[in-house]
């Protein structure tokens, strides 16, 4: 059974190109290493109807997990909790545990719980808050028809804190799958020359091989070759990746290429 | 009339988190500065059916432009042209102009046009190739029911070359809109304290204001305040952004905050 995942990142700054979406790649990498297959990453604006409708679309594809990032803060344009509630046809309610966390973070410093601060404890009905150790706004999770939805703040270190806490303690189903990859660099072989050989090895072994061009195809051919596989037995997965790597290296040598610095030998 | 845009980035490396999607932010920034409103950025795997189905979804939302990046190369997993053709119910055909470009790039160097190399000239029926000045695989464009689709390679400098060539010479409809933003940094005011004031100014002026937290809400409040607006008259747009900036700065001073280094005065 495939454990699929989707990532939804919310924030106008992603759509104007102001912010590079490093949250998406952090989350994708973390989920991949846990054995999830990330199928789609979507970035949308801070808009209520848009958030609600994309949440519905994603749930229609029934992933095992959806990680949502951004829009949990105190400002007028933070509307992820409300958007998720709307997408699920649930009410937005004051969550007592989240409220306790906010009280602790503001009131113990003598700061009043204004309307903007209280807003961060308004979660979709049935959601469980996830403590934010690196900032204020709590994350939250809820399971809908077998899909774990987890919402994290957009500030990177807060996203990481909430995501790790979720993955380590609250994940409903953990994939029984191990993912492994290795890469190496090749000089002097064009991507289009290596292509038919790689196609043959992929077809025969089922291992994923991708060439990432780094130089210029004809004038200065320089490629990174990535080999990735996943399976239940970590030792077996590593062994398969390494044996395929040796086969590709042998082909590169036959084609007159040279192996550059190996990144993860 | 709103000129909406979508971006579709294709490549397994984006979904495993191996590659940070800097192409998406480059394209988003370029389109935003031209006056487009980027509504959605999607990243998916190199999978034929997935590409075809996402292309259909995007066209169903009728954006003015869709920029697709990645998957135009010579390898077995480069299948963007075929996926777009399938999504449009068009045939994939050998394009004579693209073939001429490949002949020039390979045969003039004494390199044969193998099957893998010829594949890069197979484009959806009716597509116009866009010369790739920075690499081999040509980009292409086609207009479907008023939506400009433009496909670029995934290697960043090749994407930039093809995209610029498209935007400067082949774009069907150019938005008559100018976008402008300024930012400044604030110390000593919590985001939740500034929030109600900003909400009021946004409501009154229609100007977009976003606070980006950079420090820690209660222990070391530090915010970047971004002010953005767009309209037909560049001078008027700048004037509005600057006057709103002064209003927000005045509020910050009243709240006891200090203005840090101004980024674009």
UniProtKB/Swiss-Prot annotation, chains A, B:
Gene3D superfamilies linked to this entry: MoaB/Mog-like domain
Name listed for the protein in its UniProt record: Protein Msed_2121
Domain of life: Archaea
Disulfide bridge partners, by residue number: none
Family membership noted in the UniProt record: Belongs to the CinA family.
UniProt xrefs under InterPro entries: CinA (IPR050101), CinA_Arc (IPR023055), MoaB/Mog-like_dom_sf (IPR036425), MoaB/Mog_dom (IPR001453)
First and last residue of the signal peptide: none
Stored HAMAP family: CinA_A
Upper taxonomic lineage: Archaea, Thermoproteota, Thermoprotei, Sulfolobales, Sulfolobaceae
């Amino acid at each position: 059974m495939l454990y699929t995942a989707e990532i939804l990142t919310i924030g106008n700054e992603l759509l104007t190109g102001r912010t590079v979406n490093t949250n998406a790649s952090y989350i994708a990498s973390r989920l991949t290493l846990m054995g999830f297959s990330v199928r789609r990453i979507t970035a949308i604006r801070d808009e209520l109807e848009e958030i609600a409708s994309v949440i519905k679309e994603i749930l229609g594809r029934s992933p095992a997990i959806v990680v949502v990032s951004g829009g949990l803060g105190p400002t007028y344009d933070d509307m992820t909790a409300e958007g998720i509630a709307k997408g699920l046809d649930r009410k937005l309610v004051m969550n007592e545990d989240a409220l306790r966390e906010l009280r602790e973070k503001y009131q113990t410093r003598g700061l009043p719980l204004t309307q903007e601060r209280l807003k961060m404890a308004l979660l979709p009905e049935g959601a469980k808050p996830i403590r934010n150790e690196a900032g204020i706004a709590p994350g939250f999770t809820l399971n809908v028809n077998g899909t774990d939805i987890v919402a994290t703040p957009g500030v990177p270190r807060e996203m990481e804190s909430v995501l790790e806490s979720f993955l380590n303690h609250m994940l409903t189903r953990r994939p029984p799958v191990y993912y492994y990859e290795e890469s190496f660099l090749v000089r002097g072989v064009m991507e289009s020359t290596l292509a038919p050989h790689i196609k043959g090895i992929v077809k025969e072994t089922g291992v994923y091989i991708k060439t990432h061009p780094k130089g210029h195809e004809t004038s200065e051919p320089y490629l990174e070759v990535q080999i990735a596989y996943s399976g239940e037995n970590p030792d077996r997965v590593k062994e398969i990746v390494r044996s395929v790597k040796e086969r590709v290296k042998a082909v590169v040598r036959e084609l007159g290429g040279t192996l550059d610095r190996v990144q993860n030998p």
